Curated annotation (Swiss-Prot):
The lineage of its organism: Eukaryota, Fungi, Dikarya, Ascomycota, Taphrinomycotina. This is LSM complex subunit lsm4. One of its GO terms (cellular component) is P-body. Residues 110-121 have a biased composition (Basic residues). Component of LSm protein complexes, which are involved in RNA processing and may function in a chaperone-like manner. Component of the cytoplasmic LSM1-LSM7 complex which is involved in mRNA degradation by activating the decapping step. The LSM1-LSM7 complex loads onto the 3'-end of single stranded RNA. Component of the nuclear LSM2-LSM8 complex, which is involved in spliceosome assembly. The LSM2-LSM8 complex plays a role in the biogenesis of the spliceosomal U4/U6-U5 tri-snRNP complex by accelerating prp24-mediated annealing of U4/U6 di-snRNA. Belongs to the snRNP Sm proteins family. Residues 2-75 form the Sm domain. Keywords: Cytoplasm, mRNA processing, mRNA splicing, Nucleus, Ribonucleoprotein, RNA-binding, Spliceosome. The keyword Secreted does not apply.
């Protein structure tokens, strides 16, 4: 599973984010982008030593600072089911297309040289 797929499925749900500097943020995921930048709401920020807590209405976390993400187990199972279903649907779409190959496609014309860029003989 790709992390962005999981993050998109987690929007609106609780998430724990640990940064490289040791700070942790607990809140509800509001938004994420392709760089894994996150916007959280109703956030509790914990300092690395664990002795200071801050309550924030909203915060923005830059993706390159993220060390660890923890999401709910039900989100993991939900995304796994969706991806399995997509794989099944994808498999039946292209059945029977690999028989042609390259060449004259059943025409009976004699084998001719391509028309390329000149090179007449």
């Amino acid at each position: 599973m790709l992390p962005l797929t999981l993050l998109n499925a987690t929007q609106g749900r609780p998430i724990l984010v640990e940064l490289k500097n040791g700070e942790t943020f607990n809140g509800h995921l509001e938004n994420c982008d392709n760089y894994m930048n996150l916007t959280l709401r109703e956030v509790i920020r914990t300092m690395p030593d664990g002795d200071k807590f801050f309550r924030l209405p909203e915060c923005y976390i830059r993706g390159n600072n993220i060390k660890y993400l923890r999401i709910q187990d039900e989100v993991l199972s939900q995304v796994a089911k969706q991806q399995a279903q997509q794989r099944e649907n994808r498999g039946s779409r292209f059945r029977g297309r690999g028989q042609r190959g390259r060449g004259n496609y059943g025409h009976t014309a004699p084998n001719r040289r391509g028309r390329g860029r000149g090179g007449h003989m």
